[in-house]
Structure formats: structure tokens, C-alpha cells
From Swiss-Prot:
The keyword Chaperone applies. Disulfide bonds: none annotated. InterPro entries: DnaJ_domain, HscB, HscB_C_sf, HscB_oligo_C, J_dom_sf. GO terms for cellular component: iron-sulfur cluster transfer complex. This is Co-chaperone protein HscB. It holds the Pfam family HSCB_C. Interacts with HscA and stimulates its ATPase activity. Interacts with IscU. Co-chaperone involved in the maturation of iron-sulfur cluster-containing proteins. Seems to help targeting proteins to be folded toward HscA.
Length: 171
């Protein structure tokens, strides 16, 4: 059973996140291992396994990027284990330039510049995410897979910038 079916949701990118949360809570109550404490060993094991599956499904579907990766996996794109990389030279050069800029910001310890950088990267991420939504809505799986790969780069860059922000705030 796929994660969307587990939560009673249609297998598409845009989902009702409130319904996801409510169904998660229901499933957690229904399959919590403590409810099976007096059951057989097989029942206890099944409850633990089901609870783990529910938690994994929840973590996957609640985050936009992992939800997209999972949806693509249902259509034959195993992005989680692939060695495939982005072939868009212009995008890769842009990423290299952004990484160098982040390194410069770290050296200068310029809080204002870092804040501006984080906002710019977030805008880039949001724009790509909107492209991804349209691609998934139109079942453009190949293009969507490439966009997810690019979003991973931006997500890592955003994470690095936020870690630098925390580091600079600790000084």
C-alpha cells in the first residue's frame, strides 16, 4: 500500500495537509504499540512495524520535497538512491557562484548580507517549487525529476546558509 492510500489521500503532489495531519493522528492512536501490549508477540511486532510505516509515511508526505520524490518514485523515478545528477550547466555554475558568495559572507561575517542571501535563495527555491507543482500536475515526470534534483541543491544551500546564520548569532 502506498503512503497516499494509507492516509486516504489521492496520489498527487498537492494534498490537504490538514487531512494528512488528522489521519496521521487517527492512525497513530489505532496502531500505537502500547495498545497491543497484552497481545501476542506477533501482534506486538505487527503493531511496531505498522507504527513505523505510519511515521515514515507521515514524514515523507508532510515535507514538499520528499513528497515530490515519493510521488515520482511511484512513477518509476527512484531519486533517493540514484546517482543521476543535474546536467544543466548554467544551473550548476549558478550554484557554484552562490556557494562562493556564501563562503565570502562567512569570511566577512556580514549579517545583513547573509540575511539578504537567505531571502534570495528562498525566493529561488519557491520559484522552482512552483515549477515543480505545475510539472507534477501535468504529469511531466522527467522534467519534474530534474526540478527535484535542482531543488535538492537549493535546499542544501539554504540549509548551509541557515547554519551559518546560527553560527554567526552564537558569536
Amino acid at each position: 500500500m502506498d503512503y497516499f492510500t494509507l492516509f486516504g489521500l489521492p496520489a498527487r503532489y498537492q494534498i490537504d495537509t490538514q487531512a494528512l495531519s488528522l489521519r496521521f493522528q487517527d492512525l497513530q492512536r489505532q496502531y500505537h504499540p502500547d495498545k497491543f501490549a497484552n497481545g501476542t508477540q506477533a501482534q506486538q511486532l505487527a503493531a511496531v512495524q505498522q507504527s513505523a510505516t505510519i511515521n515514515q509515511a507521515w514524514q515523507t508526505l508532510r515535507h514538499p520535497l520528499t513528497r515530490a520524490e515519493y510521488l515520482l518514485s511511484l512513477h518509476g523515478f527512484d531519486l533517493a538512491s540514484e546517482q543521476h545528477t543535474v546536467r544543466d550547466t548554467a544551473f550548476l555554475m549558478e550554484q557554484l557562484t552562490l556557494r562562493e558568495e556564501l563562503d565570502d559572507i562567512e569570511q566577512s561575517k556580514d549579517d545583513a548580507r547573509l540575511e539578504s542571501f537567505i531571502k534570495r535563495v528562498q525566493k529561488m527555491f519557491d520559484a522552482r517549487l512552483q515549477q515543480l507543482v505545475e510539472q507534477l500536475d501535468n504529469a511531466a515526470w522527467d522534467t519534474a525529476a530534474d526540478t527535484v534534483r535542482k531543488l535538492r541543491f537549493l535546499d542544501k544551500l539554504r540549509s548551509s546558509a541557515e547554519q551559518l546564520e546560527e553560527k554567526l548569532l552564537d558569536f
